[in-house]
């Protein structure tokens, strides 16, 4: 039954990411993907520190946050931003450093 809940949670996370993706058209920086990835990292930190059940953690962190965050879209967007080095490096730094900070902030809560 955990697999079913995990799949549902993944779909819900992907749906949330889809709504954030609307912000990608309004900015040079893909803000929707950045927000989705940082939120997913933060939530993984929160779940890591506050969810005791391994099954519930798997559903929330692997399922929901796995569907919410996106490594492939991030790298596709980075490839598209290569022509503007300043935006490229800003996005790369914000995503990876911001992701680590977000996880630690989630753990600290």
Curated annotation (Swiss-Prot):
It is found in: Cell membrane. One of its GO terms (biological process) is cellular detoxification of fluoride. The keyword NADP does not apply. It is a multi-pass membrane protein. Keywords: Cell membrane, Ion channel, Ion transport, Membrane, Metal-binding, Sodium, Transmembrane, Transmembrane helix, Transport. InterPro entries: FluC (IPR003691). It comes from the Bacteria. The chain crosses the membrane at residues 1-21, 29-49, 55-75, 87-107. Na(+) binds at residues 66, 69. Coiled coil: none annotated. The keyword Metal-binding applies. Na(+) is not transported, but it plays an essential structural role and its presence is essential for fluoride channel function. Pfam families: CRCB. Its main location: membrane. It catalyses: fluoride(in) = fluoride(out). GO terms for cellular component: plasma membrane. GO terms for molecular function: fluoride channel activity; metal ion binding. Fluoride-specific ion channel. Important for reducing fluoride concentration in the cell, thus reducing its toxicity. Belongs to the fluoride channel Fluc/FEX (TC 1.A.43) family. PANTHER family: FLUORIDE EXPORT PROTEIN 1-RELATED. NCBIfam families: PRK14229.1 (NF010825). This is Fluoride-specific ion channel FluC 1. The gene is fluC1.
């Amino acid at each position: 039954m955990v697999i079913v809940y995990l799949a549902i949670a993944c779909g819900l996370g992907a749906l949330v990411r889809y709504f954030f993706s609307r912000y990608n058209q309004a900015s040079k920086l893909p803000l929707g993907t950045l927000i989705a990835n940082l939120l997913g990292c933060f939530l993984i930190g929160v779940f890591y520190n506050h969810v005791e059940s391994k099954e519930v953690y798997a559903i929330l962190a692997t399922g929901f946050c796995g569907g919410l965050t996106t490594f492939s879209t991030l790298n596709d967007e980075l490839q598209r931003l290569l022509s503007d080095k300043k935006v490229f490096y800003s996005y790369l730094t914000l995503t990876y450093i911001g992701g680590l900070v977000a996880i630690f902030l989630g753990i600290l809560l």
